Design a protein with these regions (language model features):
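Short amphipathic alpha-helical surface micro-motifs
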Residues: 80-82, 142-145, 166-171
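Aromatic-lined carbohydrate-recognition surfaces of secreted/lumenal glycan-active proteins
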Residues: 127-145
Length: 198
């Protein structure tokens, strides 16, 4: 999925193993599918979710849930694993591939801004070298307080996938007046409950 394939302000969804294998969401133009976590987990539904997204006309992309914290070597290893699985599962080169950097489930965001940023940049470089468009995903608080987004976007351009919710609960449409004011945003996740899908 390249920026030229999905127009600005298009809707998309992200799915993981706890969602259905049928990726058919009304109004969505793309789907970002969890592929891996760490270097030994593969989403058991990823293959079917990617095929379903394609069959329903959604452009598929992928992400891996980080377990690397602030370790550059682990970030590279996790990104290499994700790139290999993205290729094997049929995510087209040029599509987005994201490093999902959050607190919990084996990952810490508390390793210091410089070290965290070094790890993220190492992962994004592996993703880019693998033929994918790199993204880093997190909530706006983590992006602003635990990473140097200035360094990241200087090297990788518009590469942030930011979660920032105006309200909790079901949201059918984005309120673009609430859009997070930060540079480098490629994708804005405005809800965790899109049209009743969560």
């Amino acid at each position: 999925m390249s920026n030229s394939n999905v127009s600005s302000k298009s809707y998309g969804v992200d799915v993981a193993s706890y969602q259905s294998t049928s990726v058919n969401y009304t109004g969505a133009k793309f789907a970002i599918i969890k592929l891996t976590q760490g270097t030994d987990y593969l989403n058991p539904k990823a293959d079917q979710q990617i095929k379903s997204a394609k069959a329903h006309g959604l452009l598929p992309a992928g992400y891996f849930y980080a377990n690397h914290s602030n370790s550059v070597s682990r970030a590279r290893s996790e990104a290499k694993y994700a790139v290999a699985k993205a290729k094997a599962l049929g995510i087209p080169e040029g599509s987005y591939l994201a490093d999902d950097f959050e607190q919990g489930s084996g990952n810490s965001v508390n390793g210091g801004v410089q070290a965290n940023t070094d790890a993220i940049m190492a992962a994004l470089q592996v993703i880019k070298d693998g033929g994918y468009q790199p993204l880093v995903y997190s909530g706006s608080f983590v992006l602003r307080n635990h990473l140097s987004i200035t360094r990241i976007i200087k090297s990788f351009g518009t590469c942030l996938w930011v979660a920032s919710y105006k309200v909790s609960g079901r949201q059918d449409y984005a309120d673009f007046n609430y859009f997070p004011s930060m540079d480098g945003v490629a994708i804005w996740q405005f809800t965790d409950n899109y049209k009743g899908y969560n």
